[in-house]
């Protein structure tokens, strides 16, 4: 864990109450579905709700050299995955996939980039039966992509697993304003059902607030939430460090819902 240096960009601080209010809105909730781990035991594995019936396709940008999630997803449920990554020439050896595109996701479609909306529409035109699944780890470009993607397109995804980067920017005025707008957009139609800090990077602390630099968020569309346990399991028994050679990074207390009084 590190503290923000006083002369850094983080010194232009968001009021702590503003950051705390957003973090509270992002607390994971019990979604009424058991969480299962899909993919590898470490990096490339994610916890998602066991609510896969009727999902037609997974979209997985930023696949890099690890398609454990997509391959395991197909073997478990028969859900095919569309892969994309401009940093590699093809999918990893042994990957099970529907298609691969050597492109990055961005806010425009051109030779090296494509919009999420364009990609989804090409493979799954409006009216095609079935929901979709998004597994996105695109090294910070998630913010531009989520701003650009219409809510009508995002609502086509039943489950979204998104790795958010540079979350310490919540401590800065501009960063908090930008991220709040993005999370507000997502929370209108989704709940957070799981959070898992990535132990590749440390946390940043300011007062009682502690923010993991990189964190995996699992979202479930609100219409799929079922009554269930009032509290999510934190940590979850299936959680595992992304880097097995480093200690697990626990979810800081400020990101955890307070258990109701007995």
Where are the language model's segments positioned?
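Conserved SAM-binding loop of SAM-dependent methyltransferases across substrates and taxa
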Residues: 64-76
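Active-site regions of enzymes building and remodeling cell-envelope glycoconjugates
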Residues: 79-80, 95-104
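Short loop/helix-cap segments at secondary-structure boundaries that form the rim of catalytic
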Residues: 73-74, 89-98, 152
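Rossmann-like AdoMet/SAM-dependent catalytic core
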Residues: 2-57, 66, 101-102, 112-130, ...
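Short, polar loop motifs at secondary-structure junctions
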Residues: 65-66, 83-91
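Short, conserved loop/helix-junction motifs that constitute active-site signature segments
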Residues: 52-53, 73-77, 151-157, 186
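Conserved acidic residues
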Residues: 103-106, 137
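Switch II (G3) loop of P-loop NTPases
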Residues: 134-141
């Amino acid at each position: 864990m590190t503290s923000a240096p006083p002369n850094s960009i983080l010194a232009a601080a968001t009021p702590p109450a503003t950051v705390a209010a957003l973090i509270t809105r992002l607390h994971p909730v019990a979604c009424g579905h058991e969480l299962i781990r899909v993919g590898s035991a470490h990096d490339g594995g994610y916890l998602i709700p066991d609510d896969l019936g009727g999902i037609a396709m997974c979209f997985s940008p930023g696949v890099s050299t690890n398609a454990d999630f997509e391959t395991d997803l197909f073997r478990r449920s028969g859900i095919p995955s569309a892969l994309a990554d401009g940093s590699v020439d093809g999918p990893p050896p042994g990957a099970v996939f529907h298609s691969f595109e050597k492109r990055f996701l961005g806010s425009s479609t051109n030779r090296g980039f494509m919009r999420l909306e364009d990609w989804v529409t090409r493979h799954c035109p409006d009216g095609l039966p079935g929901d979709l699944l998004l597994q996105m780890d695109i090294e910070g470009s998630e913010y531009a992509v989520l701003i650009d993607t219409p809510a009508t397109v995002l609502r086509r995804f039943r489950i979204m697993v998104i790795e958010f980067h540079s979350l310490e920017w919540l401590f800065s005025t501009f960063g908090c304003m930008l991220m709040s707008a993005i999370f507000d957009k997502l929370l209108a139609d989704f709940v957070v059902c799981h959070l898992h800090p990535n132990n590749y990077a440390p946390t940043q602390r300011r007062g009682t607030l502690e923010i993991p630099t990189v964190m995996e968020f699992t979202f479930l569309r609100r219409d799929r939430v079922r009554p269930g346990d009032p509290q999510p399991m934190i940590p979850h028994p299936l959680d595992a460090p992304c880097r097995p050679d480093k200690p697990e990074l626990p979810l800081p207390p400020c990101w955890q819902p307070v258990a109701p009084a007995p």
